[in-house]
Amino acid sequence: MPVWLMAQANADHIRWQDRRTLTWADYQGKADPDAGAAASTATYLSVEYNFKDGKLGYVITCSFSRSKSWGLTKNDYILSHEQGHFDIAEIFARRLYKKLKAYEFDKKNYQTDLRRIYEDITAEKEEMQNRYDRETNHSINKEKQAGWLEKIKIELKELEAFAGY
């Protein structure tokens, strides 16, 4: 029986794809004018796993929620910042895949081990998302924003071998 960690992807969700970037049409959530942000991007990282015939099977999903994402200020610059959030989620999907490929699971402990790995990865993802917003001042600091987008691009490239999760 498969077990899900996090939310299962559905019609509301767009899976991360290298050749598809977000557009403002993807942002269908109700904007929150009191949020103090120009936009909000809701990303999800999930893993479905099972242990069958002595082998661990898993499916990792990195997705964007249309209904939970919104934009007040809709321009290409803000959209680029928001795409950065989605790309950071993809970095951690690849890191999760890398850890799962390298880890030696056993039938007795695999559920506990997988939960720990998943929780560690998601905590690191949230920390990086927060640091991205903090250091770029939510994209206001254009120099830092450009640096972060380059850093994200480099890390995605470095983890390219783990994109086939």
Stretch-by-stretch model annotation:
Residues 1-11:
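Bacterial Sec-dependent N-terminal signal peptides
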Residues 10-54, 60, 64, 105-165:
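Metalloprotease/metallohydrolase-associated module, dominated by Zn2+-dependent proteases
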Residues 64-66, 90-92:
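A mature extracytoplasmic/lumenal domain signature
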Residues 71-72:
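C-terminal soluble interaction/assembly domains
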Residues 77-89:
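Active-site recognition of the HExxH zinc-binding catalytic motif
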Residues 88, 94-101, 105, 126, ...:
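Sec-exported extracytoplasmic/periplasmic mature domains
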